Amino acid sequence: MVTADETVLATTTNTTSMSVEPTDPRSAGESSSDSEPDTIEQLKAEQREVMADAANGSEVNGNQENGKEEAASADVEVIEIDDTEESTDPSPDGSDENGDAASTSVPIEEEARKKDEGASEVTVASSEIEQDDDGDVMEITEEPNGKSEDTANGTVTEEVLDEEEPEPSVNGTTEIATEKEPEDSSMPVEQNGKGVKRPVECIELDDDDDDEIQEISTPAPAKKAKIDDVKATSVPEEDNNEQAQKRLLDKLEEYVKEQKDQPSSKSRKVLDTLLGAINAQVQKEPLSVRKLILDKVLVLPNTISFPPSQVCDLLIEHDPEMPLTKVINRMFGEERPKLSDSEKRERAQLKQHNPVPNMTKLLVDIGQDLVQEATYCDIVHAKNLPEVPKNLETYKQVAAQLKPVWETLKRKNEPYKLKMHRCDVCGFQTESKLVMSTHKENLHFTGSKFQCTMCKETDTSEQRMKDHYFETHLVIAKSEEKESKYPCAICEEDFNFKGVREQHYKQCKKDYIRIRNIMMPKQDDHLYINRWLWERPQLDPSILQQQQQAALQQAQQKKQQQLLHQQQAAQAAAAAQLLRKQQLQQQQQQQQARLREQQQAAQFRQVAQLLQQQSAQAQRAQQNQGNVNHNTLIAAMQASLRRGGQQGNSLAVSQLLQKQMAALKSQQGAQQLQAAVNSMRSQNSQKTPTHRSSKLVTTPSHATVGSSSAPTFVCEICDASVQEKEKYLQHLQTTHKQMVGKVLQDMSQGAPLACSRCRDRFWTYEGLERHLVMSHGLVTADLLLKAQKKEDGGRCKTCGKNYAFNMLQHLVADHQVKLCSAEIMYSCDVCAFKCSSYQTLEAHLTSNHPKGDKKTSTPAKKDDCITLDD
């Protein structure tokens, strides 16, 4: 039987040698007092009792991962005791045949209890190093309080004797629970539940007694088989979580590399790739991956973000657990928060004019809050006011009401305001400390000396001041930059002369545009990573159908507009062709009238010559003969008139001829006959109707003279018909406010303004402007200015519609008239003065050539006209 001072127990799974090592060194008296035979007998008795207790109380748990538990009893085969060697250190030979390293146990000591109880706890520690052929190690430590510790594979198992279940292991390894052996009568009794602390003694015996011990302690074969099962289950426990993690990460890396190299996986998500790798690993090692997931070691992310760079923006791949629509429905139910009309308009404007409306709205709100804070601060503190308030009491009330609002805004805007840093030398202010530190590195010249920006040191030498910066402040000072004279607006290069800068700017601008075009990112560059991460979503069929219908409607509207424009163009072309035909007919009629006049003049000249010849012959015949046959003369004159084709004037001509014949009969002289011929010529010229009445449409300023009616004048501004020249002058003065101060005598010399294109003459400047636009498509500078002021009104000559303004726009849009600008040069008829404004010419005539001026000057030609420079 073992004494009460020794409670060292060692168990092994196979036949091994056991070395007992002391935890506390023995004294010399104890080692000399014990005898060898007594010690052997005590150990034998102790071994028999331990074997009986261990067979009933030892339990071995199975593999926790497979969910099976097995009970095994400890078996002791061989105990070898060596009493010739005592040592507190573990055996140096700690390796078996397989080379597995042995482990050393740590003695467990409990601290002393409370002093008022007056008892100390007995600490029993056992340290045992066991090695078998397979390298399994098991250490058991017993304590007086009924708990046993198993340190096999680094785990500790405790069992409480008061009907409590054993606690499970942390990492799921094998658990062994042993019951406390019955105390010997020679052991001290616990006092008040506390054990008495006593020293522990370990005894080592020689190897000579191994045979006797082996004969005594022969184990049962059944128990040996159960211990072998415990050994088999302890081998897979070495594959812990760390190794499983390493294997899983290695497999994930290999799988991702394989998927990355395949061209068909370019559009696959990163999260999908990771899930595929994990599924592949689950098929190979389901238990290890399951344990990693249960222990929350393997956690899949919901978001994978790529940081922004100079190539691409910030990209985030997100697989949310709950979509945003569900969150909104959970917060607000089926009814979403309704926006007011002003909020809807503001949101629509932001979406229309800004590519990122939400961020723009955030920045706008921050800016508005800052502006409101500054404004309310001025009102509350009565500073920077535009004017002095009239009623101070009302102003104080308003300021008192705005003060809490200002304080709220001030607290709200605190994150957006930074402290201003000021340079003591030059007064430069900035919110950035980095900018201020860079600014202070520059030398400051105050006009007469250099001033240090970090202290009060001054010096007149720039080099000494730089040395001061370096020696005192450890800063390499930089010279102050010179003020730019002629900098380039693009590259900020400075030039001494402006001309050199302009030449450089032209080339720099070309290079800048070319570089910008090269550096401009393309759509493929922006969407490269997006295409790799996820595919482009397919369009909804209904949305696609709506888009197609909208495209068809737009195409139809475009075709209709083109047809309408073509019809309008055809109508305008037909109207222009008709107008050209009318103009050609008028020109032909004018040419025919001129030919008739020329023929009449030739006929009258022939008649006059014939009359002169006949009169000369009559005189000679009168002198030679008394009577002359005058009938031949009358017949010749009538025949000549018939050849001319003038039937309307034959009566007047015949009357004149009869008078001439009567004069001839009365034997008047040749002078009277010549006078009659001249009078006939003048009367024919007066009574011959003018064919210029056909110019009524093109030259409205000319009067139409009928044979029995008064002359009619067509207004050159509004196309109104007016009888008599005096009424026409009154119409221009009252209706159009033109020719103010003019009298009827001023209109006797004809219209003063003439067109250089068609030689038509006009009374007013507005009539000339209207004629140039309608007939020739020329726009003067004054008319263009009127169009910009919405004052270009009037009557259209083409369609006859009246417009209060936008006449030029009507001509371009409706009649497809091509307008071009024209510069009118006005010249004075009296002197060589020329100008580009009609008002300037009027002022010149009024000041330099008044009506009462009798000075003779170069008369103005009848065909003087205004020159147009297109």
From Swiss-Prot:
One of its GO terms (molecular function) is RNA binding. One of its GO terms (cellular component) is nucleus. Expressed in somatic cells of embryos, the head, hypodermis and tail of larvae and the germline of adults, including oocytes but not mature sperm and spermatocytes. Keywords: Developmental protein, Differentiation, Gonadal differentiation, Metal-binding, Nucleus, Repeat, Repressor, RNA-binding, Sexual differentiation, Ubl conjugation, Zinc, Zinc-finger. Residues 9-20, 673-688, 695-708 have a biased composition (Polar residues). Residues 1-244, 673-708, 847-870 are annotated as: Disordered. Disruption phenotype: Worms exhibit temperature-dependent arrested elongation of gonadal arms. Mutants raised at 25 degrees C show reduced numbers of descendants of the gonadal precursors Z1 and Z4, while mutants raised at 15 degrees C show wild type gonadal development. Vulval defects are also temperature sensitive. Mutants grown at 20 degrees C showed protruding vulva (80%) and some had pseudovulvae (15%). At 15 degrees C, fewer mutants exhibited everted (36%) or additional small vulvae (7%). The keyword Heme does not apply. Its main location: nucleus. InterPro entries: Znf_C2H2_type. The keyword Repressor applies. GO terms for biological process: gonad development; gonadal mesoderm development; nematode larval development; oocyte development; positive regulation of gene expression; positive regulation of transcription by RNA polymerase II; regulation of gene expression; vulval development. Residues 77-99, 129-142, 203-214 have a biased composition (Acidic residues). It is found in: Nucleus. A zinc finger (C2H2-type) spans 421-444, 450-473, 713-736, 753-776, 794-815, 826-849. Residues 41-51, 850-870 have a biased composition (Basic and acidic residues). Sumoylated. A zinc finger (CCHC-type) spans 486-508. Has a broad role in development, specifically in the genetic pathway SynMuvB that negatively regulates specification of the vulval cell fate. Required for fem-3 3'-UTR-mediated repression in the regulation of the sperm/oocyte switch. Acts by regulating the translation of fem-3 mRNA, by binding to its 3'-UTR. Interacts with hda-1, let-418, lin-1, mog-1, mog-4, mog-5, mog-6, pie-1 and unc-98. This is MOG interacting and ectopic P-granules protein 1. It comes from Caenorhabditis elegans. The gene is mep-1.
